[in-house]
């Protein structure tokens, strides 16, 4: 009897420590995440699911669709506390043409993000890891985070500002144009043409043996073949 009571108490504690809430969202093709949310993209339609270690913060989380953009953020009055051990959001999607992350969170996609024109922007110390299939891809990184891309694209335009890294060896691109400003690194692939510029102490490494190479370094950085 005593063991049963202990197990019951432990189960109640576990349930209390794992608060979950489902929310309906409208159609969207853009995702804008602001804050320390760990977002996982999954295929399909359905409710958005929030899972957290602190049930009290659920009422402070904003999930709204406006102008075809799903924004996930906190209310302005919200203050982070040490009781929050994790904060996860599962987002079903059918089509995306823009993904933005600001802050220390993360965005990960298990399924491939298909788009004619895809724009990915990371600002801050967070991480983005996406598998994509896009005709035109624009990837911008400003801060200390990591932006990882894999899959296929015809044209890649990359920009790194700060100390973060653009990791795109796994993104098979035909034509790549990349600029690194600061101490960060850009790792890209180009099979046809590459235009690479380094301003500062950062590095660009490229693979793919492109037929046309246009490279220039201003500062102590370096551009090399991988």
What are these regions (language model features)?
Residues 1-226:
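Intrinsically disordered, low-complexity terminal regions
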């Amino acid at each position: 009897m005593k063991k049963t009571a202990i197990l019951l108490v432990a189960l109640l504690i576990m349930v209390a420590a794992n608060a979950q809430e489902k929310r309906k969202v409208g159609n969207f093709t853009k995702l804008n995440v602001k804050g320390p949310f760990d977002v996982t993209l999954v295929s399909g339609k359905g409710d958005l699911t929030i899972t957290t270690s602190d049930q009290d913060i659920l009422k402070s989380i904003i999930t709204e669709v406006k102008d075809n953009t799903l924004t996930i953020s906190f209310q302005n009055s919200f203050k982070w506390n040490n009781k929050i051990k994790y904060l996860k959001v599962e987002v079903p999607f059918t089509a995306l043409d823009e993904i933005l992350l600001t802050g220390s969170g993360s965005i990960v996609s298990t399924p491939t993000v298909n788009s004619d024109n895809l724009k990915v922007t990371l600002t801050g110390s967070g991480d983005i890891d996406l598998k994509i299939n896009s005709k035109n891809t624009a990837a911008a990184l400003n801060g200390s985070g990591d932006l990882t891309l894999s899959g296929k694209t015809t044209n890649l335009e990359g920009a790194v500002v700060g100390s973060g890294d653009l990791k795109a060896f796994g993104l098979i691109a035909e034509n790549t144009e990349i600029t690194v400003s600061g101490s960060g690194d850009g790792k890209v692939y180009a099979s046809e043409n590459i235009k690479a510029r380094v301003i500062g102490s950062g590095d660009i490494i490229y693979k793919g043996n492109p037929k046309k190479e246009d490279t220039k370094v201003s500062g102590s950085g370096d551009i090399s073949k991988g």
